[in-house]
Amino acid sequence: MEDERYGEFEGPDTIQAVTAALERLGANVELIDVGPDIYYQLDKRKAHIDLVFNNTEGLEEKELREAIVPFFCEHLHIPYTGSSPKTFINKMDKATAKRIVAYDGVPTARFQLMVPGDQLGDLSFPLMVKPYSEGTSIGIS
């Protein structure tokens, strides 16, 4: 079985295809691994960065991992693609995300935030059970 921790990471073929497409458009592309030193890596290159094409899933097993690169880019005043740190933080908290979209009138299914030991309450089967802080299908079996 594939390791769920890496379920959202892009494979080498996708990274190469995006790199090639950007280079065909005349971009000088440099791939930067997202590791514990990502702030330093961005800071030392910031004078030469026109845009960070942010496709990172961030640091392994960190709840706010997707917000790290956009946060650092904003702090260093480096333009980047994708969502803001606040958006990434809100989308990783499913209850908050559902409340935000419901407030704006987007229909959303009823939900209940559960912690170990909680009772099901008034929800009935069929149900979708999803970890509150994961993206895509991580945590669903």
Regions found by a protein language model. Name each.
Residues M1-P79, V115-D118:
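ATP-binding N-terminal substructure of ATP-dependent carboxylate-amine bond-forming enzymes
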Residues G82-T87:
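A short, structured active-site edge motif that brings together acidic residues
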